[in-house]
Amino acid sequence: VTQDATFEDGAARPLRLVAMDDEDLQVLSALCQDAVFPASEMQWQRGRQRFGILLNRFRWEDIPVADRGRRTPERVQCVLAVETVQRVASQGVTQGDADTILSVLSVTYEPDEAGGGAVLLTLAGDGAIRLSVSELEVALRDVTRPYAAVSGKVPDHPA
């Protein structure tokens, strides 16, 4: 008896996603939850109106495969890039400090009356980064192979 192939049988492919509306951004936010990064891995290219972060993203999409294979959950390095950035503001973030590790809780969008708005990165420990944008365009792109999560565990958020 033969068995049909499943999606899990295929090789894992790097994610390359773009959010152009709030619904798309909710997907990116879920994928970025619990991503960690040193404060030194943020960069605003003012002339190109681009803000980017090199994240170490937890691979939420891989949990069923990891559980079934009884292997350690994984992380992957990815770039989160926000386009059309006019202004950057932060709270509770020491920029440029390689020893300060930040953790993403969510990525949301707050539209304004002028047709633009703000992309808000909410960080653990009351930190936040607010990116004023002329339009919503956020990309998430995996840039390395997955690696075993150092903790060996799935992130947990007890109530």
Where are these regions (language model features)?
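A short, charged
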Residues: V88-T94, D156-A159
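Intrinsic, low-complexity N-terminal interaction/targeting segments
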Residues: Q26-D34, S90-L121, V138-R141
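Long, hydrophobic N-terminal alpha-helical segment
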Residues: V1-G52
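Short, low-complexity cationic-aromatic patches
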Residues: A39-G52, E110-G115, V119-D126
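Short, well-structured hydrophobic secondary-structure segments
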Residues: Q33-R87
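Residues that cap or initiate secondary-structure elements
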Residues: R59-E61, Q86, T94, E113, ...
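Short acidic, gly/pro-rich beta-turn/loop elements at beta-sheet edges
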Residues: I63-V65, S90, L131, R141
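Mixed-charge, glycine-accented linear interaction segment located at domain edges/termini
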Residues: T122-A159
